[in-house]
A protein has these predicted regions:
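Metal-coordinating catalytic core of metallo-dependent amide/deamination hydrolases
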Residues: 1-106, 147
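Active-site-adjacent C-terminal substructures of enzyme catalytic domains
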Residues: 9, 100-172
C-alpha cells in the first residue's frame, strides 16, 4: 500500500543502558530501526567535557544544588557502560540488517577511530571543527543539529553549526 509519509526510527543507544542491552538487541533485529546512534553523555568527556558547563546545564533543567550536581557527576562517571564487545555485537546486528550507524558528540580522533571499527557512516554533532574535519576525512557524513543552526551556537558551548557549514565541515 502506498503511503504519503514514511516514518523512520532513529534508535539512540546510551552506553550506560547496560540493563536494556537485550531489549536493544531485540529491537535492532525487529526490522523497525533505520538508524542507530551510540552515545555517551557521561560528564567529563564528549559534549560535556567541561564539568562546570555540565553543572550549569543541569541547573537549567532541574533545581539542584552544587553538591547534588557533584553527586550526579560522580554517579554518572561511575555507572557501568556497555563493553566494546557488546557495542560491536550491536553494530554487527545493525550492519546485517542494513541499519546505518552513527557516532554521537565526537570529541577526538580516538573516538572516530573507535567508530571506524564499528563501521559507522555518520558523525552526529562533532563537538569541534577539528573533529568535524577529521570525521569528513575518514569518510563519515557529518551532521549538525537544527537548534544549533538557528541559535548560531551549540547550547553546550561546543561547535557552532554555522561555523562548521561555512568551513565545509558539515554535510547535513
Amino acid at each position: 500500500r502506498d503511503h504519503l509519509i514514511r516514518h523512520r526510527l532513529h534508535m539512540r543507544v546510551e552506553l550506560d543502558s547496560v540493563d536494556l542491552y537485550d531489549d536493544i538487541e531485540e529491537f535492532l533485529r525487529s526490522g523497525k530501526v533505520d538508524l542507530v546512534s551510540f552515545m555517551d553523555h557521561t560528564p567529563g568527556q564528549g559534549q560535556y567535557r567541561d564539568l562546570l558547563l555540565f553543572g550549569d546545564t543541569l541547573k537549567g533543567y532541574r533545581d539542584v544544588t552544587d553538591e547534588e550536581v557533584r553527586d550526579i557527576v560522580r554517579m554518572q562517571q561511575e555507572s557501568s557502560k556497555m563493553t566494546y564487545a557488546q557495542i560491536a555485537a550491536l553494530a554487527s546486528i545493525a550492519r546485517e540488517r542494513g541499519i546505518s550507524i552513527a557516532s554521537h558528540d565526537d570529541d577526538s580522533a580516538e573516538k572516530l577511530a573507535f567508530m571506524d571499527g564499528l563501521e559507522a557512516s555518520i558523525s552526529e554533532f562533532p563537538i569541534s571543527l577539528d573533529v568535524a574535519r577529521e570525521a569528513r576525512a575518514r569518510g563519515l557524513h557529518t551532521v549538525a543539529g537544527a537548534p544549533n543552526v538557528m541559535l548560531g551556537h551549540s547550547h553546550s558551548g561546543n561547535l557552532s553549526a554555522r561555523e562548521a557549514v561555512e568551513a565545509g565541515a558539515i554535510d547535513v
